[in-house]
Regions:
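His/Asp/Glu-rich metal-coordinating catalytic cores
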Residues: 1, 5-9, 13-203, 209-218
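A short helix->loop->beta-strand "cap" motif at the edges of active sites that frequently abuts
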Residues: 20-25, 187-189, 221-223, 304-306, ...
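Short acidic-hydrophobic, aromatic-tinged amphipathic segments that line or gate anion-handling sites
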Residues: 75-83, 259-266, 399-401
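Hard-cation-handling environments
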Residues: 176-319, 332, 375
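A short, acidic, amphipathic alpha-helical segment used as a generic capping/interface helix at domain edges
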Residues: 291-300, 352-367
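Generic long, charged, amphipathic alpha-helical segments
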Residues: 332-363
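Proline-aspartate-enriched helix->loop->beta-strand connector
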Residues: 364, 368-377
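Short acidic, glycine/proline-enriched helix-loop-strand junctions
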Residues: 381-408
Length: 409
């Protein structure tokens, strides 16, 4: 397991269910596995609620997997330290190295002994982090520089140059982000940050602490920073347990800052919403489709005293997040309630933790390998990206599509 976000690991319990009978080992770094347990359990709870709702509507359906399947799957998890070669059998040796994307994220080296005894070396990237915005990713490990392999299987989320950013863009956007928060807090407004419970919340806690702990205007007004969500609290505790050495001590110092207020109950959410004083609220989830954030959005979006700042992917065209932040329409329908957009809504794009277009090009150009295979990337732009990279790097590059998903090497 290269990382713990649900789009990478959320269906593992299904493989372990009675229908599928997976009996293998699940290997990953300690941080990845610990976070994954929290995210998978939360995913299962949502899945079960969805099944119950479908049944109440008369649909015949059953869960893809059960809680017992999930716990049985957890028993198959084994911690593998980064930068330690592990021999799985006489044919395969692996090693996890830092991907720099989020807590515990890894790339994996696989050395496969072929029948003729030669070694075929594969590197699979998972999601890779960017060096362009380390300023706003204080916990990110430095991505390992890879130089040589036979096959590199690469993500390419930022496969359009027009979507990319550089260090200058990051600096300007972060300054605007801080100015927007300061200006609107001093105007008595409530600021909502829809965030994902994993990684984004924890990094914002550090960013706010480093920026605001000694700011006179902030401390004089005693503005609270609300962290609202059960899952974000559980994952923050994983960070407290699994960060190492100075990072662990510093993160615990941040979490003990008296301006941070943690809420884990819906009654607490209602109490927070009843207050009119200015504050910063971080609530999950980032897509604004469900979770505590929906209640805050419904209250703040229609108010001139509300501010909503998005700092990551908020869903595709037609989603609630897109309708709020990107659509020119003046109203949004949320849970059958039509809301006129009166709040200030701003989107920031440089907070992404993905490697950027120019960094991918530089990586591919400097990599000595027989083939690069583009895998994790948007379908509509993948082929254009591959053609551009072939031209710019003079490398043999292919991409996985629904037409050619089997490769022989």
């Amino acid at each position: 397991m290269l990382m713990s976000r649900v789009d990478h690991c959320g269906n593992l319990a299904y493989l372990n269910s009675n229908n599928n009978g997976f009996n293998g080992r699940i290997l990953g770094t300690n941080q990845t596995l610990e976070v994954a347990k929290e995210l998978i359990e939360d995913t299962l709870n949502i899945h079960i609620k969805n099944i119950e709702k479908l049944k109440s509507l008369g649909r015949k359906t059953r869960p893809l997997y059960t809680k017992q399947d999930m716990f049985d799957m957890f028993e198959k998890m084994e911690v593998v330290p980064s930068y330690k070669k592990i021999t799985l059998n006489e044919w395969v040796t692996i090693e996890f190295v830092n991907a720099g994307h989020c807590l515990g994220s890894s790339m994996i080296h696989l050395w496969i002994k072929k029948p003729n005894q030669s070694i075929f070396h594969i590197i699979m990237s998972g999601d890779m982090g960017s060096e362009q915005n380390k300023l706003i990713h204080p916990l990110a490990e430095k991505r390992e520089q890879i130089t040589k392999c036979n096959l590199f299987i690469s993500e390419a989320t930022y496969n359009k140059k027009s979507r990319s950013f550089n260090k200058c863009d990051v600096q300007k956007e972060f300054e605007d982000f801080k100015c927007t928060i300061k200006e609107n807090l001093l105007q008595g407004k409530q600021i909502l940050l829809p965030v994902f419970s994993f990684n984004k919340v924890q990094e914002f806690l550090i960013l706010f602490y480093e920026w605001l702990k000694d700011e006179e205007w902030f401390n004089k007004n005693n503005f609270p920073i609300i962290c609202d969500g059960v899952l974000m609290h559980k994952i923050t505790n994983v960070f407290k347990r699994t960060l190492c050495d100075d990072k662990k001590d510093y993160f615990n110092e941040v979490c003990n800052w008296n301006k941070i207020k943690v809420n884990k109950t819906f009654d607490g959410t209602m109490a927070i919403m009843s207050k009119k004083e200015p504050m910063i609220i971080m609530a999950s989830s980032g897509f604004m489709q469900q979770g505590r954030v929906v209640a805050y959005v419904k209250q703040l979006l229609g108010s001139k005293k509300g501010v909503i700042l998005t700092t990551g992917y908020i869903g595709g065209e037609g989603s609630i997040g897109w309708k709020i932040a990107e659509s020119p329409q003046k109203t949004v329908s949320i849970e059958k309630q039509v809301i006129l957009k009166r709040a200030l809504v701003k989107s920031y794009h440089c907070f992404s933790s993905h490697i950027q277009y120019d960094e991918l090009e530089s990586l591919y150009a400097g990599l000595r390998c027989e083939k690069i295979l583009i895998h994790h990337s948007s379908k509509e732009d993948k082929l254009n990206f591959v053609n551009e990279m072939r031209k710019n790097t003079n490398k043999k590059i292919e991409c996985v599509t629904d037409k050619n998903y089997e490769f022989i090497f």
